UniProtKB/Swiss-Prot annotation:
This is ABC multidrug transporter I. It comes from Aspergillus fumigatus (strain ATCC MYA-4609 / CBS 101355 / FGSC A1100 / Af293) (Neosartorya fumigata). The gene is abcI. Keywords: ATP-binding, Cell membrane, Glycoprotein, Membrane, Nucleotide-binding, Repeat, Transmembrane, Transmembrane helix, Transport. Residues 85-95 have a biased composition (Basic and acidic residues). The lineage of its organism: Eukaryota, Fungi, Dikarya, Ascomycota, Pezizomycotina. Pfam families: ABC2_membrane, ABC2_membrane_7, ABC_tran, ABC_trans_N, PDR_CDR.
Length: 1485
């Protein structure tokens, strides 16, 4: 196989480092110049591209001993890339100037290829041709947001609901995403795909790599060599791969482990001579780490939002490296340079160029921001406008083509910006004398122009020539097929698209799964602590169970809870299965492994971890509780618990595979779990179940497992009847012949109860059920696993096509506002439109002097900022620039008072005085992350900011008018009523960025506007729009400080001043930029660095100071040059002058005009506005409310039907308690929904509270109030079926009390979830705390173990502190008080009265002494005794009283009050700083 190592870029700045001496380098370069007079090289590039092909033949002669060379190269790379294990960001590593031995990518790649050729590995080359390609998808239309009532209405549309649950059904209107694309890309060629966001670039890349899922139809022809798309997908799926824009990885694996796993599945069967699998693996990993300059992260975990790991830029590089390991022949890279600095992005592009040249791959690349040097790496360019192909041809001729159409280019505009700009009606300009009338200006007209051009004719000729070439070069495709087979390892079927056989996939995945589980220390620690803690609690509660009638029922309760707890430990598999879909889908298209292999590997590894945890749990429970001391019974106990866990694990994974989203999964799981618990045989015995429920026993892991555990425990157990259980009992009743034990299975005249008899009479369980149930459980586990494997292989969920933007329906007010905005859009075409109509004023001047910032590190302290000086004036736009990791965001945070750890020194002043108490309120800070409440519309988000952050004295009408101006300024007219949504389903990245800026502008900052990377992740046109907006604001008088990452010339010329930082937080320049950057460039020129005339000053100055991977210009440190310069002294003088001048102006005007108060509005107004927003959000979050309501109704309905029309029998007394006990499941279903909702709202609150929008109290109160309507509705819908279907007492006094208890339980659960979420840093940790809390509440409330039987330690305090103690006591006594009991024939205890006595005469002393129950007939000698006469006698054994029910209700209400108090305190004091401390604790594990 033509195996290509996973490589992409050089990590150093030299051009040809493979040559040992400078003279050899010059001689070699001279030879190449003669052979390639038109070769293209890049200024200060880390990778030389055009020389690659010329050097190839030269290097072939140099590598004479292939095997020896391969070994040496491996050792060389291994030495050069030994991982350091540091966790610092790559951008903070030393610059290339300080690096050791240089490393050359070209030499390594050519050496690898040469070694492969010598080993007889055939070359893989395949081109792609597409013709009349049309792709259709769903969405892209104006869809109105659905609300909570809509969810209820849609649910009763049963057929459509079922279709949606299965992932089918209507998803919107079909539309064309791409239309009539045609082109050809031959092996060894690269094409750059350009287009505005939403134009179809991603769809084209997916389609061209055969990623067709999610699109409704794909028409036209796509050929991969001689293979059509279907054949190619079937036989060579892994040869066409797509690198998505998002980075999806296992967060607990290290970088090296992530790449190592990819190589475990992709290491070829045929390798260079003498290179073993282990050597090949290590060699490629080290090469990748070296190429991407991430050697220091080799042993650092990838991480995610919960786990601290590598930086975003490093994670992006790991994604790139992972796909390169696939060794595919057709590669598509979708905006893969996002998050990379310009130097790394350029090296990535050059690495693709080298790999494409040497390995003859076919490479498609889409980039949002591409420099001219990046553009030069490509052979062809494809330009897309609104799904239409408006140009495809040579990259070197594309610019001239669009110029010939009449489009004007701006000075210093890069070719990619120019080409994309020609498709943007607001950015393109026409040549003098030309206009839209004679220049193609619509997608259709541009297509027509291209079709009439010579480029279209040349393309047709090239496509025809390529088709003919396919017939002539059949040997190439024979080599391709042979190489594809040679890449497969031994035992891999020839028809398989995978590189390794199924058993090796399982083995590789088992190794990975073990690392995932082992390295997720926090989850493992919490799991073990929870399991061990619950085991100890169970052991102490049921400590040394007696082998008497008193321990029979509690022994069953212990077995049931043990099985249930460990079974529900598997619930996390549902979440992890759904969250892991994106990783599985990515690896599926990379052909790393079959999804079925993953599920098998997971179950094998998880079994190992589960056995260890369950073994400890079982040992504690089994021996502390004194279960049967028999080795066989003990190991059978463990076996059943483990099997129950595995069965539920497979079950939850099946749900995760089958469900299209988490809401559907939760709905389905709630129904099935409720049925499993109800039919388990503990709450209601099998013989007493409704006929329609009994069959569930045979597919119920809990029912089968519980029966097996009971048989295992009781089959050989002999119990003794206690005196309390003997009837009659007391003085005078000594003759056992006339007494009977009330425990089921007892025989008259005997105090011995065989366990088998007890099981048969009570549960209808028999000794033979044990291994029969074990076999059924094994079959269920295998069945669930089979379903898991099947659905994992056949089902795939995800989005294809464009995402849908939802809108709020227009009313009269919004219709009028939108009409006014549309009328003003005509001003949009005026490029010099000002923002003066917004009346932005900012007179104060912000200065900082000698600012230093030190943070604590394990070794002491680390200085991130060092003596930084500067100022920002009204009407000036100041850029803050520097390399990644130089401290730009840190400086912004320090200046904006957003840092809450470390030590800040220096002077930060407003008008020469310390910032006032209202500073945070008067400064707007647009953070890099666009965090918004997703269910708000754009207009609502801006109005919310204006309502709370502009002075309360400003009339609301004036605030809202100002908001309309902001909408117009930010060109958001079409999106004013659009729901912001999430990046996956909502506004695009660029649109969200504009909303972020709009929210800050709507606050009308009195002092300063900070912006952190406002152009990050945007395409060039969007970035230009953002900077143009800022330019308008500055012209209107706003003071702005903005960090920006590698702007092009057009962006850079909009700034007035520059603050430039180098690594270490040192300033290297602060001052004016000047027209055409002449002031800035003059400073550098005078200090030894001369900018070439054709270079972008913004990029060049960063290279000059060594910000990228190139060496700095000059020997002196640029920070030192600045500190000794006259410009620095001038800045200090200007700051002193500005402070004095502004202080005098403030004094003369009678003081600062800024109102000094913490919040702009009073508390009552904050509560009003925040509550309104929160209620709207809940109303629109239809799945949140409806899923909760659905779970309530289903659980209540199923429970009610299971206990349908309970009679007055003795068993029904217990069943009524179990029905009431089901109310305690409410916290379990409420906490898992409330906590994530609260956490996300808190994340938004942290962002909004940082600028003092509203108080913590207003936030917490609004969350509580917003939950009230849904809590009341859920309580009503839960109460009605649960209460009336079983036939509970219908008297208003009883039913009303019971409803109050259900409602209080609902409110208690909601406030409990909010309290837990407020006390924990994230919902994951909260979810780990929930199970023990719910278990403790349910265990100590008096049902699972009655109060008299509870150990004194727990009874003395925890029983009283358990909120559910009051719930159970109040509801049980209210239901059973005064209820007459009528035993069924099977429930009577039968015994013979002594001779010459009737039953009534014999039992009279017993009843006179307060004995419970009654006799069926007092006149006979054959006595039939019922243990209870009225319900009061039943619950008296639980130490409950009807007289205390209102006290219980009051105490239960008090628990809600305590939740609220803790919630408000936690929200007030749990700042992001406190959450950071929790985060550090989390990271320790």
């Amino acid at each position: 196989m033509d195996e290509k190592p996973a490589v992409s870029e050089s990590s150093n700045g030299s051009d040809v480092d493979s040559l040992s001496t400078a003279s050899a380098y010059e001689q070699h370069r001279e030879r190449l110049r003669d052979a390639n007079p038109q070769g293209v090289t890049s200024h200060r590039s880390g990778v030389n591209v055009k020389e690659a092909e010329e050097e190839f033949s030269e290097l072939n002669r140099q590598f004479s001993t292939i095997s020896h060379q391969a070994h040496c190269l491996s050792k060389q790379i291994s030495r050069a890339s030994k991982p350091t294990g540091k966790t610092e960001d790559v951008e903070r590593s030393d610059s290339p100037a300080d690096s050791d031995e240089p490393w050359d990518l070209e030499t390594a790649l050519r050496g690898n290829r040469d070694a492969e050729t010598a080993a007889g590995i055939r070359s893989k080359r395949i081109g792609v041709i597409w013709d009349n390609l049309t792709v259709r998808g769903m969405g892209g239309v104006k869809t109105y947001i659905k609300t909570f009532p809509d969810a209820i209405i849609d649910f009763f549309n049963v057929p459509e609901t079922i279709m949606h649950m299965l992932g089918y059904g209507k998803k919107g209107k079909e539309f064309e995403i791409l239309r009539n694309f045609r082109g050809v890309l031959q092996p060894g060629e690269m094409v750059l795909v350009l287009g505005r966001p939403g134009s179809g670039c991603t769809t084209f890349l997916k389609t061209i790599t055969n990623q067709r899922f999610g699109y409704t139809s794909i028409d036209g022809d796509v050929l991969y060599g001689i293979f059509d798309a279907d054949t190619f997908a079937k036989r060579f799926r892994g040869e066409a791969v797509y690198n998505q824009e998002d980075d999806v990885h296992q967060p607990t694996l290290t970088v090296k482990q992530t790449l190592g796993f990819a190589l475990d599945t992709k290491t070829p069967g045929k390798r260079p001579l003498g290179v073993s699998k282990a050597e090949f693996r290590e060699k490629v990993i080290n090469m990748l780490l070296k190429m991407f300059n991430i050697e220091h992260t080799a042993n650092t975990v990838i991480g995610n939002q919960f786990i601290r790991g590598v930086s975003g830029g490093e994670r992006r590089r790991v994604s790139i490296a992972e796909m390169m390991i696939t060794s595919a022949t057709v590669l598509a890279w979708d905006n893969s340079t996002r998050g990379l600095d310009a130097s790394t992005a350029l090296d990535f592009a050059k690495s693709l160029r080298i790999m494409t040249n040497i390995y003859k791959t076919t490479t498609f690349v889409s980039l949002y921001q591409a420099s001219e040097n990046i553009y030069k790496q490509f052979d062809k360019v494809l330009v897309i406008d609104s799904g239409r192909q408006v140009f495809f041809g040579p990259a070197s001729e594309a610019r001239s083509y669009f110029e010939s159409l009449g489009f004007k280019e701006r000075p210093r505009q890069t070719t990619p910006d120019y080409l994309t700009g020609c498709t943007d009606p607001f950015e393109r300009e026409f040549k003098e004398g030309r206009s839209e009338d004679d220049v193609p200006s619509t997608p259709d007209s541009l297509v027509e122009a291209f079709n009439r051009s010579s480029y279209s004719e040349r393309l047709a000729q090239e496509m025809d020539a390529y088709r003919k070439k396919l017939e002539q070069e059949k040997h190439v495709y024979e080599d391709f097929e042979i190489a594809n087979q040679e890449a497969k390892r031994k035992f891999t079927p020839k028809s398989s698209v995978y590189s390794i056989p199924f058993h090796l996939q399982i083995w590789a995945l088992m190794q990975r799964q073990f690392l995932i589980k082992w390295q997720d220390r926090f989850a493992q620690t919490v799991s073990w602590i929870t399991s061990t803690g619950v085991a100890i609690i169970l052991g102490t509660v049921w400590l040394r169970l007696p082998k008497t009638s008193a321990g029979a029922f509690t022994r069953g309760g212990l077995l049931f809870i043990s099985l249930l707890f460990n079974g529900f430990q598997a619930f996390s598999e549902l979440v992890s299965t759904m969250m892991g879909r994106s990783i599985v889908n990515k690896h599926r298209q990379f052909t790393f492994y079959r999804p079925s292999a993953l599920w098998i590997a997971q179950i094998l590894v998880d079994t190992t971890f589960a056995i260890a945890r369950i073994l400890v749990f079982s040992i504690i429970v089994y021996f502390m509780c004194g279960l049967v001391l028999d080795a066989g019974a003990f190991f059978t106990f463990i076996l059943i618990i483990v099997l129950g866990y595995l069965c539920m694990t497979c079950f939850f994974r099946v749900i995760g595979c089958m469900s299209p989203d988490f809401d559907y999964a939760m709905k389905f799981a709630s129904v099935v779990i409720t049925l499993f618990v109800l039919t388990s045989g503990y709450l209601i015995q099998w013989s007493s179940e409704q006929e329609w429920l009994r069959w569930l026993y045979y597919i119920n892991p809990f029912g089968l497992g519980f029966a097996a555990l009971m048989v295992n425990e009781f089959k050989d157990l002999t119990m003794t009847c206690t005196a309390d259980s003997l009837v009659p009992s007391g003085p005078g009743y000594d003759d056992m012949a006339s007494r009977v034990c009330t425990l089921a299975g007892g025989e008259p005249g005997s105090v011995i109860i065989p366990g088998a008899s007890y099981l048969a009479k009570t549960f209808s369980y028999f000794p033979g059920d044990l291994w029969r149930n074990f076999g059924i459980m094994v079959a269920l586990t295998v069945g669930f696993l089979t379903l898991n494997l099947y659905h994992g292989e056949t089902l795939q969920f995800g989005a294809g096509g464009r995402t849908v933007t939802f809108y709020q329906k227009e009313n009269k007010e919004r219709r009028a506002l939108n009409g006014a905005l549309m009328e003003k859009r005509t001003n949009r075409e005026s490029k010099d439109q000002s923002a003066a109509n917004l009346k932005i004023t900012s007179k104060s001047v912000f200065t900082w002097e000698d600012v230093c910032y030190d943070v604590p590190v394990p070794s002491g302290t680390r200085r991130l900022l060092q003596s930084v000086y500067g100022y920002v004036q009204p009407g000036k736009l100041t850029a803050l620039m520097g390399a990644s990791g130089a401290g730009k965001t840190t400086l912004l945070d320090v200046l904006a008072s957003r840092k809450n750890i470390g030590v800040i020194s220096g002077n930060i002043l407003v008008d020469g005085a310390p910032p006032p108490g209202s500073f945070l309120r008067t400064v707007s800070y647009a953070e890099q992350l666009d965090i918004h409440e997703p269910m708000q519309t754009v207009r609502e988000a801006l109005r919310f900011s204006a309502d709370l952050r502009q002075p309360y004295e400003t009339p609301q009408s004036e605030k809202y008018e100002y908001v309309e101006g902001i909408i117009q300024l930010l060109e958001l007219e079409d999106l004013a009523d659009a729901i912001i949504g999430t990046p996956e389903t909502g506004l695009s990245v660029e649109e969200r960025k504009r909303v972020t800026i709009g929210v800050e502008l709507a606050a009308k900052p009195e002092l300063l506007l900070f912006l952190d990377e406002p152009t990050s992740g945007l395409d060039s046109q969007s970035a230009f729009n953002i900077i143009r907006f800022l330019r308008k604001l500055a012209a209107a008088g706003q003071a702005i400080l903005c960090t920006i990452h590698q702007p092009n010339s057009a962006l850079f010329e909009n700034f007035d001043r520059l603050l430039l930082l180098q690594r270490g937080g040192e300033c290297v320049y602060f001052g004016d930029i000047g027209e055409d950057s002449h002031v800035l460039l003059d400073y550098f020129r005078r200090n030894g660095a001369d900018c070439p005339p054709d270079a972008n000053p913004a990029e060049w100055m960063l290279d000059a100071i060594g910000a990228g991977q190139t060496r700095r210009i000059g020997d002196r440190d640029w920070g030192e040059i600045w500190r000794t310069s006259s410009e620095f002294e001038q800045v200090k003088r200007e700051i002193i002058q500005i402070k004095a001048q502004r202080a005098e102006e403030v004094r003369q005007s009678g003081g600062s005009q800024i109102i000094v108060r913490e919040y702009a509005t009073p508390l009552w107004h904050q509560i009003k506005v925040v509550c309104k927003r929160t209620n709207i959000v809940f109303w629109r979050s239809r799945n949140y409310g409806f899923t909760r309501l659905f779970n309530h109704v289903v659980i209540a309905l199923v429970t009610g039907l299971a206990f349908l029309n309970l009679d007055d029998s003795r068993a029904s007394l217990q069943y009524r308690i179990f029905v009431i006990f089901n109310v305690t499941v409410l916290p379990a279903i409420i906490l898992q929904q409330v906590e994530p909702r609260f956490e996300f709202s808190r994340l938004v609150f942290f962002r909004e509270s940082a600028c003092k929008s509203y108080s913590q109290f207003a936030f917490a109160l609004s969350m509580v109030i917003a939950e009230l309507p849904y809590s009341i509705l859920c309580a009503v819908c839960f109460f009605l079926p649960l209460y009336y279907i079983p036939g509970f007492q219908a008297a208003p006094s009883r039913a009303g009390y019971q409803f109050l208890m259900v409602l209080i339980t609902e409110l208690f659960s909601v406030t409990l979830g909010q309290m837990i979420s407020a006390l924990t840093p994230n919902s994951f940790i909260a979810s780990q705390i929930n199970p023990p809390i719910v278990i403790i509440f349910s265990l100590f409330c008096g049902v699972a173990i009655p109060r008299p039987q509870m150990p004194g330690f727990w009874r003395a305090w925890l029983y009283q502190l358990d909120p559910f103690t009051r719930l159970i006591s109040g509801m049980v006594t209210t239901e059973l008080h005064g209820r007459t009991v009528s035993c069924s024939p099977s429930e009577f205890n039968r015994f013979q009265a002594p001779e010459n006595q009737t039953c009534g005469e014999y039992m009279l002393p017993f009843f006179e002494r307060g004995g419970l129950g009654y006799l069926a007939d007092n006149t006979t000698q054959a006595c039939e005794y019922c243990a209870y006469k009225i319900g009061d006698e039943f619950y008296s054994a639980f130490s409950m009283s009807f007289n205390t029910r209102w006290r219980d209700l009051g105490i239960f209400l008090a628990f809600i009050g305590s939740n609220l108090i803790i919630l408000f305190l936690a929200v007030s004091f749990m700042s992001p700083r406190c959450r950071l401390r929790y985060k550090l604790i989390y990271d320790i594990f």
